[in-house]
Amino acid sequence: MEKILEVQGLKKTFKLSAKQQKIEKTKTKVKVAVNDLSFTAYRGEVFGLLGPNGAGKTTTLRMLATLIRPEAGDAVLDGSSIVKEPEEVRGKIGFLTSELKLEEFFTPNYLFDFFADLHKVPASEKKQRRERLFERFGIDRFAEVKVGNLSTGMKQKVSLVISMVHDPDVIIFDEPTNGLDVLTAKVVTDFLLDLKSQGKTIIVSTHIFSLIEKICDRVGIIIDGRMVMCDSLEAVCNGKTLEDRFFELYEETVSSGSLGAEGGKEN
């Protein structure tokens, strides 16, 4: 298998305000969001990051997408370093997160044109890609409607289409079905499976077990900013359901006091 993403020792901390310290129930002024995180993803696979809220999944994907810079470590994506060559990385990936909001006074058409031009997509390809993606997600009827007047599900569809405007080979999705109704979530999941069939590499974070089981080839379980296990879905489950295996690993990790032993376990 050909490596397309190699993550080595990523670390990221954040300062906590007094209010955040109260919420976190800690006197510590610094939160370690990601701590010595390493894993590998291979070309054409769907790799899932599974963990509870606050485990460091979103921070990890934001570092991979070069939105924030790691304090230590690096990741090489298709030959480009996220630390040394962030602009090259941005040109190779599509990135979707529900936490990045679209400007509500722009229309889907305007946003598609803006990002297509930003990625220097040729006019002929832009037209064909817009028609195909807008029709696929039912956006064509809302192409000139301001984003602020769209439903939550339609906004997520527009965000998804924009992340694919330049037809990237590597797509990073942070909680892609978060907050969506079941019908829209199915549309998004089916699209991920379609991308998988096209040979795209997908890195996806979620806390939804069924999504991992449905689309992922390999999974990394992340707890408290550390990778506690990383392997094929079959090997991680070890004859059990993913949910049962996750909570088993979680209890083992908490009871051992290690919260993700140094470097994690990857096969």
Question: Residue spans of the language-model regions?
Answer:
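Conserved ABC transporter NBD signature motif
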Residues: 73-84, 88-89
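Conserved ABC ATPase "signature" region
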Residues: 113, 117, 124-142
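Conserved ABC ATPase signature
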Residues: 146-150
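Catalytic Walker B motif of ABC-type/P-loop ATPase nucleotide-binding domains
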Residues: 171-175
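Helical segment within the ABC ATPase nucleotide-binding domain
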Residues: 186-198
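ABC ATPase "signature
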Residues: 230-231
